[in-house]
């Protein structure tokens, strides 16, 4: 498939670049969602102090790691 050229000689990002960008955006959105919802779930079960911070970080990584591949697959379908 030929690469499209923009109006000023700029080429479009490749399919792999789009998939990477989707993965990074999905991880960022998932981690932000984990930062918003993580404290509520951790406080609800009674975590405090260092355990609370670890639980929030774990929730952020889990939600980012879950949403990132879905966004990457979505961007791959659009290629």
Curated annotation (Swiss-Prot):
Recorded family membership: Belongs to the MGR2 family.
Topology in membrane: Single-pass membrane protein
Function: Has antibacterial activity against a variety of bacteria including S.aureus, P.aeruginosa and M.tuberculosis. Acts by inducing bacterial membrane breakage. Induces production of reactive oxygen species (ROS) which are necessary for cell proliferation. May play a role in inducing oxidative DNA damage and replicative senescence. May play a role in the coordination of mitochondrial morphology and cell proliferation.
One Gene Ontology cellular component: mitochondrion
Biological process annotations from GO: cellular response to reactive oxygen species; defense response to bacterium; positive regulation of reactive oxygen species metabolic process; protein import into mitochondrial matrix; protein insertion into mitochondrial inner membrane; replicative senescence
Keywords: Antibiotic, Antimicrobial, Membrane, Mitochondrion, Mitochondrion inner membrane, Transmembrane, Transmembrane helix
Region (Sufficient for antibacterial activity): 42-60
InterPro entries: Romo1/Mgr2
Name of the protein in question: Reactive oxygen species modulator 1
TM annotation in the entry: 22-44
Organism lineage string: Eukaryota, Metazoa, Chordata, Craniata, Vertebrata
Subcellular location: Mitochondrion inner membrane
Chief location bin: mitochondrion
Pfam families noted in UniProt: Romo1
């Amino acid at each position: 498939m030929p690469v499209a050229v923009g109006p000023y000689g700029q080429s479009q990002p490749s399919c792999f670049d789009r998939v990477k960008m989707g993965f990074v955006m999905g991880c960022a959105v998932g981690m932000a969602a984990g930062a918003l919802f993580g404290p509520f779930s951790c406080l609800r079960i009674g975590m405090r102090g260092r355990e609370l911070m670890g639980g929030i970080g774990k929730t952020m990584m889990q939600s980012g790691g879950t949403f990132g591949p879905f966004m990457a697959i979505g961007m791959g379908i659009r290629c």
